[in-house]
């Protein structure tokens, strides 16, 4: 994988002759960052043409990475230099929250965060967990709700109660085959706060395969990633 990543990064680096700003999955849930670091070092050793490669640990996954890329693009369009953009965007992950729930607890059990028995009983009782990214980029269980509607409403509450400067923010909603639920969450958010924009999308295949069908996440900037914990 590192060799393949190195070749791909090298092709972009040589062909486009541009600086590269790369947003990785949280390095505490994936080897993505370390693989990218190996690839970047190999590319620079092989064909350093004066262009820069900078890596940012998103402390997130899915749309958490995507929002960072969008904000970075907007900074560039405003005339900021590559290093100015990179230096600024590196401060964002510490405030970019990713909070999510899953449709079936068996997917949490597969990660080792629950036993199979607990997952089975939880599904029978319609227990819905809320998980979040910790300040260090680990996935931690945060709260529990009873029933699908209750957990969706709690995601809305967490976003609306912890978001900062919402009128200048883009918030993200990512889901795995839960489009109607995503529309409900967005509707409830808009009833409570005014935001600059909302992105509603499906999970990427990698994240989606880990969290399973009917999973749904919200992403937003807060003062930190603690959410009152």
Residue ranges and their predicted role:
Residues 23, 56:
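Hydrophobic residues at beta-strand termini and immediately following loops
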Residues 19-21:
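Structural motif
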Residues 29-32, 36-42, 48-54, 60-70, ...:
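Mixed-charge interfacial surface used for oligomerization/domain docking
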Residues 26:
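Active-site pre-Tyr helix/loop in NAD(P)-dependent dehydrogenases
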Residues 2-13:
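Single conserved hydrophobic/aromatic residue that forms the stacking wall/gate
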